């Protein structure tokens, strides 16, 4: 036997004994993953989440607990948080790895439509079958200084009761009173209000790059060739002038707005620096009596588990983690057996076998205080929704 074979012999003896003791069975389901105590796994996961949240917010330590004002959240901040939470709830998780720019938390900003009583609407050539929503681009640029920082932009409208089904179309304000078609939506009859959302990320990026002082959208009824009536039947919150007092204030707050998610400028400066991606549970493989790799529920209470009072909303969330066996086949007659043996020799704490890891993750919107100022941000990849063997 050559010298290299003698050096590998001690590594192969345990596997040979296993094959001799179990004749007639393939070497399937073998794993070098370590058995981890469940409570230890949960504690490690909680500590990883603690570091992940601070890292995504670019904080070296939690803000002072005494800085949190003991008062209810302002209505505008709460409305912004609820809009962000509802949007996340309506989206499916992205299983692909996030780009480097998506690692850090996104600052969420709400830019309200200019009230329809403003004189700037007089400059727009109107149609009786449409509603018009104008925005000051100066407010957009204040929220997002550079177009490249914008991650997503949505136009959100609160649709009130609708008696009959209607097909509507959204247009972008173009040059010389012309309008460019963007998308359409078929609205079903409903007795309850409903938020409508349109992805306008590309349009807002254009406005940030070379837009005018005022830009906007038009919502119109779909005009089919065989229909004589193209009246817009949809009642959108913010376009009725019959309300007074506090009701008018609430009505105005829920008028159409742009929901912007962008990387803050100070965080963007770190995007080009080299860093090692943080990943939860990469140092551990799990095995249990479960039949398959699966999602295990883990609820994080910010006060109880992390000792934090500075995150105002939510009070906690289901972070979850992945757990379960990942069977694989490793036989002695494969050309990779020596490579795997050497890998284990040089990486005794690692596993050459596939392990149960997150596949689909979802973001987490939060409201937290910086001094006495509340902020709404979205933390990417915080909730495990599905797992895979990798």
From Swiss-Prot:
Site, Cleavage: residue positions: 278-279
Record SMART domains: TGFB
Molecular function via GO: cytokine activity; growth factor activity; type I transforming growth factor beta receptor binding; type II transforming growth factor beta receptor binding; type III transforming growth factor beta receptor binding
Region (Bowtie tail): 226-252
Disulfide bond positions: 285-294, 293-356, 322-387, 326-389
One GO cellular component term: cell surface
Keywords: Cleavage on pair of basic residues, Disulfide bond, Extracellular matrix, Glycoprotein, Growth factor, Mitogen, Secreted, Signal
Motif Cell attachment site positions after renumbering to this chain: 244-246
Straightjacket domain as annotated region, ranges: 30-74
Post-translational modification: Transforming growth factor beta-1 proprotein: The precursor proprotein is cleaved in the Golgi apparatus by FURIN to form Transforming growth factor beta-1 (TGF-beta-1) and Latency-associated peptide (LAP) chains, which remain non-covalently linked, rendering TGF-beta-1 inactive.
Glycan attachment positions: 82, 136, 176
Function: Transforming growth factor beta-1 proprotein: Precursor of the Latency-associated peptide (LAP) and Transforming growth factor beta-1 (TGF-beta-1) chains, which constitute the regulatory and active subunit of TGF-beta-1, respectively.
Subunit organization: Homodimer; disulfide-linked. Interacts with the serine proteases, HTRA1 and HTRA3: the interaction with either inhibits TGFB1-mediated signaling and the HTRA protease activity is required for this inhibition. May interact with THSD4; this interaction may lead to sequestration by FBN1 microfibril assembly and attenuation of TGFB signaling. Interacts with CD109, DPT and ASPN. Interacts with EFEMP2. Interacts with TSKU; the interaction contributes to regulation of the hair cycle. Interacts with TGFBR3.
Protein name: Transforming growth factor beta-1 proprotein
């Amino acid at each position: 036997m050559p010298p290299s074979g003698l050096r590998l012999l001690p590594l192969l003896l345990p596997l040979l004994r296993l094959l001799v003791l179990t004749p007639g069975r393939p070497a399937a389901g073998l794993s070098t993953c370590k058995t981890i105590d469940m409570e230890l796994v949960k504690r490690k996961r909680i500590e990883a989440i603690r570091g992940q949240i601070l890292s995504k917010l670019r904080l070296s330590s939690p803000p002072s607990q005494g800085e949190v004002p003991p008062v209810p959240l302002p209505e505008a901040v709460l409305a912004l948080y609820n809009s962000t939470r509802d949007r996340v709830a309506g989206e499916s998780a992205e299983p692909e790895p996030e780009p480097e720019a998506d690692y850090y938390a996104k600052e969420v900003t709400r830019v309200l439509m200019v009230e329809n009583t403003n004189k700037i609407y007089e400059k727009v050539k109107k149609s009786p079958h449409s509603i018009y929503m104008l925005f000051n681009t100066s407010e957009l640029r204040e929220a997002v200084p550079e177009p490249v920082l914008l991650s997503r932009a949505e136009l959100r409208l609160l649709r009130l009761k609708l008696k009959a089904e209607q097909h509507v179309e959204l247009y972008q304000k173009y040059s010389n009173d012309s309008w460019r078609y963007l998308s359409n939506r078929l609205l079903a009859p409903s007795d309850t209000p409903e938020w409508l959302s349109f992805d306008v990320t590309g349009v807002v990026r254009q406005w940030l790059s070379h837009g005018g002082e005022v830009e906007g959208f038009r919502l119109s009824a779909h005009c089919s060739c065989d229909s004589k009536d193209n009246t817009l039947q949809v009642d959108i919150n913010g376009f009725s002038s019959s309300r007074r007092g506090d009701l008018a204030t609430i009505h105005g707050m829920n008028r159409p707005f742009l929901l912007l998610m962008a990387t803050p400028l100070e965080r963007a400066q770190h995007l080009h620096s080299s860093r090692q991606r943080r990943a939860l549970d990469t140092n551990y493989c799990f095995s249990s009596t479960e039949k398959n790799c699966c999602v295990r529920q883990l609820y994080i209470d910010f006060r109880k588990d992390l000792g934090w009072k500075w995150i105002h909303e939510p009070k906690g969330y289901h972070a979850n983690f992945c757990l379960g066996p990942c069977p694989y086949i490793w036989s002695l007659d494969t050309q990779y057996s020596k490579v795997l043996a050497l890998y284990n020799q040089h990486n005794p704490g690692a596993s050459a076998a596939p392990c149960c890891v997150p596949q689909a993750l979802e973001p987490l919107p939060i409201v937290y205080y910086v001094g006495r100022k509340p902020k709404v941000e979205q933390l990417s990849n915080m909730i495990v929704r599905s797992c895979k063997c990798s």
